[in-house]
Amino acid sequence: MVLQGEAGDGWSPERFELSFGLQLDADHDPHSVPDPVVVDGRFVLRGSIDLVERHTTSRVLRVTDHKTGKNRTEVTTTINGGRTLQPVLYSLVVEEMTREPVAAGRLYYCTQAGGFTSHTVQLDPIARKTGLHALEVIDRGVELGFLAASPDTGACDYCDYRPVCGPLEEKRATKKNKGLLADLLALRDLP
């Protein structure tokens, strides 16, 4: 973290392991809160944010989620079809918690596998709308009681839960009612 903070990019680490809606303990930032955070007045979120930084000049905040895998993002990635929600959703959470503007969320691939690269998502109106849309899709699935496993082609190759689902989940997914999966399939088309 020291090297990251000394990178000369104008960002200074401010909060580490900032949790919300989780049990408070010594492993989490002192600014953590025991209650979940409500985003957009309707979505209750819980989690832990790896790093919150403050820009030394503009004083805005930036949220960072550390990743250990390969960087599979593209320049246009915002939520990556619902697979990469942290930059946007964690930014919205930090805005709600601090009542301060968050300029961006980013993924920092902090291992050799990820090439020590980062991907930044500016928290502009389009990113906000896209993140909230993803939450709406998830909320509808919960409301309808339909959160069926429906992996995208090749997704099981990188999934930690493959032993739970078994080797044939992709094949089973092709037999599911596409009408019930319409929200999920539309979400996957978002950048």
Regions found by a protein language model. Give the residues of each.
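RecB-family 4Fe-4S metal-dependent nuclease core
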Residues: 1-191
